[in-house]
A protein has these predicted regions:
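Amphipathic helix/helix-loop-helix segment enriched in hydrophobic residues with interspersed Lys/Arg
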Residues: 1-166
Length: 166
């Protein structure tokens, strides 16, 4: 740790990244990590600037990796160029997870649901160890304000619901 960090370990409005030490949030990190690891779905919300991203990056993500998970950060675009399912699949591929198909795609996977995609693949880290994707949707609430197509929203929520209720 450098001298500047020892003098003032807080970053103000900047967020912490994975691997950095976050001060004064040990209890929150412990509580949230236990909740995430024991539940299918967890919502972390709060005012802007209170440290949600820092807690995830510097606290939760390292613990998730130790638990056999790989964090997959997803910030959805709402411009209708790519549908949400394709964006989630792309984020999984971009996360560094290696994938192996354990079943063939039914229709060339063009209409494959998120549930089918997640269950048709096994996921591994770079060392070939089996891993579970931890899907983290950043700014998820934007879907309610930026996505004007109600059918698009409804279909995405249906797909997420199917995955979560498995």
């Amino acid at each position: 740790m450098d001298k500047e960090q020892l003098k003032n370990p807080w970053k103000g409005l900047n967020f912490y990244t994975e691997g950095e030490i976050i001060y004064g949030r040990k209890a929150e990190i412990q509580s949230l990590s236990q909740y995430i690891f024991n539940n299918t779905q967890t919502v972390l919300y709060g005012r802007s600037g209170i440290g949600k991203t820092s807690i995830l990056n510097a606290g939760i993500f390292p613990k998730a990796r130790l638990e056999g998970m790989i964090p997959v950060c997803i910030r959805l675009k709402h411009d209708d160029v790519d549908n949400y399912i394709w964006q989630v699949r792309a984020a999984i591929k971009d996360s560094g997870l290696k994938m192996k198909s354990i079943l063939p795609a039914i229709d060339g996977h063009t209409n494959e649901s998120l549930w089918e995609f997640m269950h048709r693949h096994e996921f591994y880290n770079e060392d070939g160890e089996s891993r579970v994707p931890l899907l983290v949707f950043d700014q998820f609430e934007e879907i309610f304000t930026l996505q004007k197509n109600e059918n698009t929203k409804r279909e995405f929520f249906k797909q997420l619901g199917n995955l979560l209720n498995d």
